[in-house]
Each structure stands twice: as structure tokens, then as C-alpha cells.
Amino acid sequence: MEAGKSAEDVFNISRLYLYINDKAILKDITIKIPNNSIFGIMGPSGSGKSTLLKVLNRLIEIYDSKIKVDGKVLYFGKDIFQIDAIKLRKEVGMVFQQPNPFPHLSIYDNIAYPLKSHGIKEKREIKKIVEECLRKVGLWKEVYDRLNSPASQLSGGQQQRLTIARALALKPKVLLMDEPTSMIDIVNSQAIEKLITELKNEIAIVIVSHNPQQVARVADYVAFLYNGELVEWGSSNEIFTSPKNELTEKYVIGRIS
């Protein structure tokens, strides 16, 4: 399949192998992730989905020092391992499965803090960005009158939307999302899915999910991983209506999980 010209690809992953303690966790992964798209990575637990996600902004280096990477991962044509990790993570934001706001900071400061840490000091600009991001994730009307309250007082779903707002505050080019709705209620899950589809007009989104139905609802492109290997990838329509591999078909219809 053609995923667009190389200049349009956010990530170009070629023959990627990842070893932790000499054990192969990812094996021969080759994928292109186009810009301004939603790219879904699905597969059963232990298939390497979250590990692949953490490679894309080099968080894997924080989680485990005994790693070895073979192959290439290009970010807008540049080797990610030749890019300063802090700069890369500013441009490639991440939202985790477990909502992780700074619990002892206020709702406002959860977004303001990273802005200040990256050199934005003007209060008026910070206030503007905070409001913009809260509006974008649909939280503003729910929290505008208690911005100084601790983030820990929010519900789990609200906390997850706050962490998305925090990630968006730094204006990333890519947002990585690792099972972002698996631990929250259905109302907030639906709000986040709607947000994801809206955000692709601005940035690329890579979402990991063990839920094929969710991937089918939101993704433009899909990769199916199994036991650390890429089974196949293509457009969402191709993967869900005419998969080339029998294993993919079994996963999509729920015969393996």
C-alpha cells in the first residue's frame, strides 16, 4: 500500500528489531506513518504495541537501559537516535493508559508547568494556552470555575482529558496514545475518541489499543502486531474488510484476543 510520499511520513520504520536483555521484543517491523492521520496499532497483550510506541519518542531508553535497537526509525526523514531526546519528546507527545496528572498541582498548573519549563514565562500567553487546551479537550466548561483546585479532585476521565490538554500545550507534531480510554468511563471514552478524530487535522496521532472496534472507529491506517511481529498493515478499510492474513481476520472477528 502507498502511505504517501516520504516527505509526508511522520515516521518511517524500517526493519526494526528491539532487544531487551538480549530477548527480541520487536522483530522486523516496517511501517510508514503518514502525517495528519490516525494510525492505530492493535494486537493482543504482549504483542509489543506499547513497546513500539515508546520507541517512537525514545521513552524506551528510560524504561530499560539494557536495550539494543537494529534497523531504522526516521522522524520526518531524520534518524530519531540522532535527535536530542528532549527535543524529540517535545514534538512527539505521549498520553498513557493510566491518567497521570501532577496530583499536587492545580488543574491550571498541570498545563502551565510544562509551558514554564520550556521557557514560556509571560502570564497572559500561558493563560491563553491553558484555556485553549482545556477547550480543545472539552474540559473548560467543567473546570473554568475551579482552575486552582487540585487535579486529583477530577474524575478519572477528566484527568485523562487533562493529560491530553497538557500534552497539546507544547504544540506537538505527533501525539502517541497508549490505550488512552481503557481505564475510564464510556462518556469520557467517547469524548476522547471524538477529540482524536478532530485532532488529525492538526497533528498525526498514533494510538495503541487492544480493542479492534475502537481502532476501526477512529483509525485511518492500522497495523496488527502479534508476538512482537508485524502481521500486516494498511488502510483501516483494508484491514477490517479484506485482511490478507488469516491471523488478522481471526483477531478482528474476536477469535483470538
From Swiss-Prot:
Residues 11-252 form the ABC transporter domain. InterPro entries: AAA+_ATPase, ABC_transporter-like_ATP-bd, ABC_transporter-like_CS, P-loop_NTPase, PstB-like. It catalyses: phosphate(out) + ATP + H2O = ADP + 2 phosphate(in) + H(+). It is a peripheral membrane protein. One of its GO terms (molecular function) is ATP binding. SMART domains: AAA. Keywords: ATP-binding, Cell membrane, Membrane, Nucleotide-binding, Phosphate transport, Translocase, Transport. It is found in: Cell membrane. The complex is composed of two ATP-binding proteins (PstB), two transmembrane proteins (PstC and PstA) and a solute-binding protein (PstS). Part of the ABC transporter complex PstSACB involved in phosphate import. Responsible for energy coupling to the transport system. Belongs to the ABC transporter superfamily. Phosphate importer (TC 3.A.1.7) family. This is Phosphate import ATP-binding protein PstB. The lineage of its organism: Archaea, Thermoproteota, Thermoprotei, Sulfolobales, Sulfolobaceae.
